[in-house]
Regions:
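Active-site-adjacent loop/helix surface patches within enzyme catalytic domains
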Residues: 1-115
Length: 117
C-alpha cells in the first residue's frame, strides 16, 4: 500500500543506551509510553542481534524528530553509548547488516528521501 504521507526524510537514531546495557523493544515501548506517546515513536527498532521490529506503521506520523515527524520515517538502533556513557558507534555487525537492508528497502519505497543520522 502506498503511503499517503509525503516522505522526504529517513532519520536514523540510537536509543542512547550503553553498549553493555540491554534495551529490548519492550523497554523502549515502556519508555515512550511513560513520556506520553501512545506507542513507540519510531517506525522501526533494531536490537543488537539485528532483529528489526516494526513499531509504528509507515503511514502514521512518528514521534522521533520534532518538526520533521510529519514527513519522515524514524529508525532507532539499540545502543549508541560506550560503557562510560559517551557517544559511540556501538552497532553490532548484525545491526549494521539489518540497517543497510532496511534502508535499501525504504530507499526503493521513498526514492526522494534523504537519509540522516
Amino acid at each position: 500500500m502506498k503511503n499517503p504521507r509525503k516522505i522526504d526524510l529517513i532519520v536514523v537514531h540510537c536509543s542512547a543506551t550503553r553498549v553493555n546495557q540491554d534495551f529490548p523493544v519492550e523497554a523502549l515501548e515502556a519508555c515512550h509510553k511513560a513520556r506520553g506517546f501512545h506507542s513507540i515513536g519510531y517506525h522501526y527498532y533494531i536490537t543488537k542481534d539485528g532483529m528489526v521490529y516494526p513499531c509504528r506503521p509507515e503511514n502514521e506520523v512518528g514521534a522521533h524528530a520534532r518538526h520533521y515527524n510529519a514527513h519522515s520515517i524514524g529508525i532507532c538502533y539499540e545502543g549508541g553509548l560506550d560503557e562510560k556513557g559517551k557517544p559511540a558507534d556501538t552497532r553490532t555487525p548484525a545491526q549494521k547488516d539489518s540497517l543497510e537492508d532496511l534502508l535499501y528497502g525504504l530507499s526503493l519505497d521513498y526514492p526522494d528521501a534523504e537519509i540522516l543520522g
